[in-house]
Amino acid sequence: MNDTRALAVAGAGAALGMVALAVATQTRLVRRMDRAVEWRVRPLRPRIRRAARIGTLAGEPYAHWPLGAAVAATIIVCNDGSPWRAVIPMGSASLGAILVHHAVKAVYARARPRHALLLGKTEPAYPSGHTADATAVLATGAYLLVREGLAPVAVVAPVAVAIGLAVGASRVALGWHWSSDVIGGWLTGIAVASGCAIAYGQLR
């Protein structure tokens, strides 16, 4: 199986998984599991809030946009070839994740956890936008850096995974999202990153 087909399969699988989970969030089983996680995290929140605020930073627009720009700039400066092969995939990772998670939220208007609602966070919960955005940019950036020969997969893959997991966990720790929102965010980010990686292959 070539790279394009493998990426297409991964992206389609992630997208289908995200939609399936969106439907599943309406079921009693998933809601019960989400409440169980929230019940366990709630008493820990005062102690982990500071670490969670740091962990969530990579999902902020002021972080993932510059991160994508830094990856693109590194590729352009270090390697020959069209700059668009880096600019388009990295820009699409940020913008694509934002557009997709907002589109899904418009369809599945899921309420946030009580903690978030009490703090005025009333926009739909599923999927976690911070998690989706960070995952898309991190995964796309890691893929491009490896394909360009600028970083070994043994280094960038663990770093990207660790940061992506930290962002997702922080959204639950801060009380902004249910655990299934975060899983949906990871799946959304993977789906978007797969499309961006395919675009890179076509532009290279």
Each model region followed by its residue ranges:
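N-terminal transmembrane-helix/juxtamembrane module of multi-pass inner/ER membrane proteins
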Residues: M1-L67, K105-L118
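Alpha-helical transmembrane segments of integral membrane proteins
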Residues: R5, V9-A10, L67, W84-A93, ...
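Short hydrophobic alpha-helical membrane-entry/anchor segments
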Residues: M18-V30, I76-G81, A106, A169-S170, ...
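Membrane-water interface at transmembrane helix exits
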Residues: T25, E38, R42, A72, ...
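Membrane-helix interface segments
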Residues: R47-I48, Y62, G81-A86, P113-R114, ...
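Membrane-embedded catalytic cores of phosphoryl/pyrophosphoryl-handling enzymes
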Residues: V71-A72, L117-R204
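Interfacial segments of alpha-helical transmembrane regions
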Residues: A73-A97
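Alpha-helical transmembrane segments in multi-pass membrane proteins
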Residues: P89-A93, A97, H101, G185, ...
